[in-house]
Amino acid sequence: LRLSLEEDVRRVVVASSNHAADFYEHLLRSREMDMLPATNDIRPLSDNYYGWAKESYEHLGFVFATGTLGRKLENVHIRIGAPRSLDAATLEGDREGFPYRRNLGAYVSPRDLTQLMVKSIETENIDNEWGVPWQVFYGISDNTRSFWGLENARRVIGYAPEDDSEVTWATDVYENLTTKGVIGRVGRVP
């Protein structure tokens, strides 16, 4: 960030991680929370060092965005979800199928991630509600099972994801969540 400031870079787009706020997943899994909105008023909380490092870098970005170091360095931090194919092996030994369902909610397609990055770079004004050019967006597709909000990215940069993991892997989802003894809100009870 310092070098970007010194070299007169206007904006940085940073690959953050969903782990910057992964503490909330425990609340989501236990249904104590419905969805984690992607707004600047939700404090990121992580319960591991990797997430803490990502969270700290987001906060450091805010310092640079405020202009207290000479000028405002615009910051967009993208908490990337799961940019990979679904893996049925995550169902092994997990009767609730949580890792599999989590990846359904966290999935981001290459097309949607590209759109999110490009719009984060090209959108003219990214000022937040305090007039600070600093934003945090979740990098996920428009997934049926998403548990992170996209409202902020939709509103600020016009993000319009085109993919949904539920549609992309419809056959696999049906097979894996209804025929492998997975219990819970999806699938059948053995």
Name what the model sees in each region.
Residues 55, 105-112, 148:
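Residue-level signal for the nucleotide or nucleotide-sugar donor/cofactor binding architecture
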Residues 69, 82-97, 107-133, 142:
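Alpha-helical substrate-binding/gating segment
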Residues 140-150:
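Active-site loop of classical SDR/Rossmann-like NAD(P)-dependent oxidoreductases
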